[in-house]
Structures are given as structure tokens and as C-alpha cells.
Amino acid sequence: MADWQPDVLGDDYEQLTLPLAPDEEGEVVATLVRRRRPGPDPYLDVLYVHGWSDYFFQTELADFWEAHGARFHALDLRKYGRSLRPGQTPGFVADLATYDEDIEAALVAMGHRGDGRSPREVALMGHSTGGLPLRLWLGRAPGRAAALVLNSPWLEFQTREVGRLLLEPVIGARARLKPTRPRPKVDLGGYTRSVSKEFGGEWSYDLAWRPQHGFRTTPAWLSAVFHGQQTVARGLGIGAPVLVLLSARSTLLPRWSPEMMRTDTAIDVAGVAQRSVQLGDLVPVARLPGARPGGGRGGRG
């Protein structure tokens, strides 16, 4: 394994490249990011995983967790952000279980090998689509994490279960015939406008790693997401407490609306709230007025 190197976030952060098994597109890596100088005697390790067409840049998350005595790490999954290599299809996997390797590699680098020898417990945190592989991995690795925090998790399709089940055969057929054929863009610009500092949002980030309209999805990737959402729908508990954070409302429109500065523009929060209670035995769901996907609070329009 390589050594920790300076990170694009500046002198306060460093990154570690995690080599993974190559695939048909060549070399595959994931990337772990952390502060260079952690706080004294952390009692908990936190591993954060981003969502679709995203990467870690929200240093406020590290500030929050480390101010509360935790050691924060963020993982750029394969083919995203720091882990995206030339010639790769951004974000592409055909099975969300593929991310088990990324998660395991990150935990091993953090000192969590699953042998009970780590001096600290670990909590997992996922945003949007990033919550799905974490939840699925934890179902296959019970007891490995003390808690799971999901921020605007994409646990159900925007058309809810009925629409997803109708689309599944069509998407599945396309996934078998042309798995990497780009689909139409899913973000027409409203999401970016609500979070980017350039348009009045809170954050500045690299548009090469998080394009204005997002990377194009593929049939195989969407089929994998549908399969993961169906696994959640079956109600398989994960044996750890789960906190789900959602906006109070969604604004799912093809055109810009000032309401997008105060609501979730990516998921159907009502449908996800209903699905969330099937994650386990202890699942508090917080519906936060004015919250946008990614953790921002609105009020500006």
C-alpha cells in the first residue's frame, strides 16, 4: 500500500490510494482522505461515503465529527473523484456488492480488520446513493459497525416501488445488452444550482469530479441500484442503530424553482422516510425543514 500523500483540500488533509482488483477498464483504486493532525484520543472512527457523481470536499463534516471526539475519514469510491482514472466510465459498477472491496480496504487502512483488535468502534455515514452500498455491506458483515448514519439516502426510486418494479425489466434488459451505454442526464441543473457557491449555494468544488449536470448513468449501474433498493424493501435488518436525515420536503421539477434552495431536489423524501424504517430495529428518522441534499440549510432564494 502506498504512503499518505498531500490532498487537494490543502495542507490540513492527506489522502491514501487503496489499490483494488483491476477490471475490464484497467487499474482500479479507491482513495481514503483524512485530516493530517487528528484531535487528541478519539473515541470513535467515522467512515463517510459520498453519493452519485460526487466526491469528498465537505470539510464541515470532518470539523463536526472531530469536534465531537471522533476520527473522521472519507472514501472516494472507485471511478469517482480522486479515484477516477483516464478511460474509466465514471461511477460505473454492475453490482453494488463490488463496493465491498472499497469499504473493506478503507476499514483495514483505518485499523479495522474485523478481528476485534481495534481500540475504537467505527460508525459509517453515507450520502444519497452512497448509503446503499454501506447498508448492503453491513448486512453481509454484521457487527462490523457500531452505527450507520444516512444523509438523504436513495433507498427508493423517485416513482416509489410501483414505478421501480415497472422499470426494472426494461432497465435489466438494457443492462444485459448495452451495460455502459449512457442514459439521459438525470440532473438538469437544479441540484447543482442549489449547492454550488457559484449559483448561491454553499460549496466550491471541482467540476471535473462533480459536473454541473452530473455524470451520465448507465443501464447496468441503474439496474444495480434497483437491486439494492429491492434488498432494502425486503426489510432485512442490519443489527445496528441507524439514523436517517432527510429534508422535510422534496422539489422534483425539470425547471429551476427557489424552493430548491430549501428542499431536496434529488430524492422523494416521503418515500424514503417510509422505506427507512425497514433498515433495522432502531431507526430514528429526522425530517429537517430547510435542509438540502448534502446537508445544507436553505433560506436563500
Task: For the regions a language model picked out, list residue spans one by one.
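Alpha/beta-hydrolase fold nucleophile elbow
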Residues: 113-128
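Short beta-to-alpha linker loops that shape the active-site pocket of alpha/beta-hydrolase fold enzymes
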Residues: 52, 76-81, 154, 289-292
